[in-house]
Amino acid sequence: AQRIITVSPDVTVSTNLSGWVNQRGLFHVNGQTDMFTVEELQTMHRWRASPTGQHIELGIAENNLFLLLAAAGLSHSIFGERLLPVGTIYDPFIERGLDALNYACYQDARFLLVATPSGISLAPEGGAHQSIGTPLIGMSKPGLASFEPAFTDELSTIMSFAFSYLQHEKTEGEDTAIEADLLGDRCGGSVYLRLTTRRIEQFEREIDDTLMSEIIDGGYWLVPPQSSCSVVIAYIGAVAPQVIESCDELNHDSPGSTAVLAITSADRLHRGWMEAQRIRYRGLEKCSAQVEKLLGAIDSNVRIVTVTDGH
């Protein structure tokens, strides 16, 4: 935790970093007096500024956010000491700093980008706060693995993976295109989490090794298909409650007719499928991607309905 630094462009409170800042403090080259403490004012925010603080507060400057994430994410190659930078931002405002994000990924900087709120949980603000196209941004960036979990146990699993993934390095001369590592996880990269502030009822379940692997690889069967399955609803992110409700209604009318495929990363499902095709082209015919394994459980005539909180 001493190597984690957080940074936010004017949205520290609204992206729920207040508790972290209370514990770890703001970074400032010189110590600053907390006037709330001096004046004995009541506040939930105890933000002490000092050279040992681990949160950097920016103004409304998303481009600066990505420049800072890039610089901090390259600390291991410049100074020989790795930092684990975490940046929080409103999801649609990623577009304000795309050029800096492109170059950060191009340089193989390592960081965790947390974008929240997004989609329907941000849409009521209207205007420029429309988070629609960002899933495509996440899929299109080499060196950036994007995830969009719906449940907290999925998020916990992904974050545990992410902090290791940020630190992985490719061994010189190592061939990354092997069946055991279709997604190139041994080489590492940065991670983008597209999250929501929507209240979603959580499951009480145990994440075993198999489910953990499926969550990280991009998807799993939330409601497994039965032999009578005729429809699959594949969803990602905050639309989970409506999908589960629809599945219950359809299966009530026609038992076993509907299955639900929970996608945690469309990016990694697609990337794994593309890499599997390349490997098969090279002669490894038995290689199969996660999405192929999942869809292999249903007949070819089953209809698939996809639902996403975006475009």
Question: What does each of the following model-derived ranges do?
Answer:
Residues 1, 62, 307-311:
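Short, intrinsically disordered, charge-balanced linker/junction segments flanking boundaries
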Residues 1-14:
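Active-site pocket-lining segments that scaffold enzyme catalytic pockets across diverse folds
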Residues 2-4, 50-53, 78-85, 107-111, ...:
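Short coil/turn connectors at secondary-structure junctions
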Residues 5, 82-89, 150, 194, ...:
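Beta-strand segments within the central parallel beta-sheet cores of soluble alpha/beta enzyme folds
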Residues 10-11, 60-64, 89, 197, ...:
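Short, flexible loop/turn elements at secondary-structure junctions
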Residues 16-137, 139, 146, 154-160, 244, 261, ...:
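Thiamine diphosphate
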Residues 54-62, 148, 232-236:
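Short acidic-aromatic active-site loops that bind/stabilize oxyanions
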